């Protein structure tokens, strides 16, 4: 899974690890198109994406800001060059699902509030999609 470490220039959650990108659509913009636009603006690439779930998230931040949002989660596949926007992102990393899960349990303070809330459902979706295929074809757990 592709993760980004948010730039310290962000108005909240700077330096924390999170999903590949986040966005708010502009008035009249389709949600999927907004997500693809921001993926390109933040991570420097475009790929086909599909919605997998949505959730309501609420968090209060150290700077006094409170977010209360209805978030949509999309997924896609990409194995090309990542040329991230340094105003948005300070680093990126590809991680296995178990690595993320273990890190979230050991060091939750390294992750954004919304990613902590979304990850269990992302992991559930991932297992349903990939576990039956990989365990039958290779006999190995792709999450280890």
For each predicted feature, which ranges?
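Structural signal for conserved beta-strand scaffold positions within catalytic alpha/beta enzyme cores
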Residues: 3, 51-53, 94
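Nudix hydrolase/Nudix homology domain
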Residues: 15, 27, 56-61, 65-144
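A structural signal for short, well-ordered beta-strand segments
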Residues: 21, 51, 72-74
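Conserved Nudix-box catalytic region and its N-terminal flanking loop in Nudix hydrolases
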Residues: 1-41
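A short coil-to-beta-strand element that immediately follows conserved catalytic motifs
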Residues: 45-55
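N-proximal short alpha-helices
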Residues: 4-8, 12, 47, 65, ...
């Amino acid at each position: 899974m592709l993760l980004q470490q948010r730039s310290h220039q962000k108005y909240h959650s700077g330096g924390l690890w999170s999903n590949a990108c986040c966005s708010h659509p502009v008035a009249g913009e389709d949600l999927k198109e907004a997500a693809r636009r921001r993926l390109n603006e933040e991570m420097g690439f475009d790929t086909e994406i599909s919605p997998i779930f949505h959730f309501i998230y609420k968090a209060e931040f150290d700077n006094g800001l409170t977010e209360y949002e209805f978030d949509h989660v999309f997924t896609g596949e990409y194995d090309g060059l990542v040329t991230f926007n340094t105003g948005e992102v300070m680093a990126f990393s590809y991680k296995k699902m178990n690595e993320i899960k273990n890190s979230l349990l050991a060091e939750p303070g390294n992750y954004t509030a919304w990613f902590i809330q979304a990850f269990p459902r992302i992991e559930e979706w991932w297992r349903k999609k990939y576990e039956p295929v990989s365990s039958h074809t290779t006999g190995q757990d792709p999450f280890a």
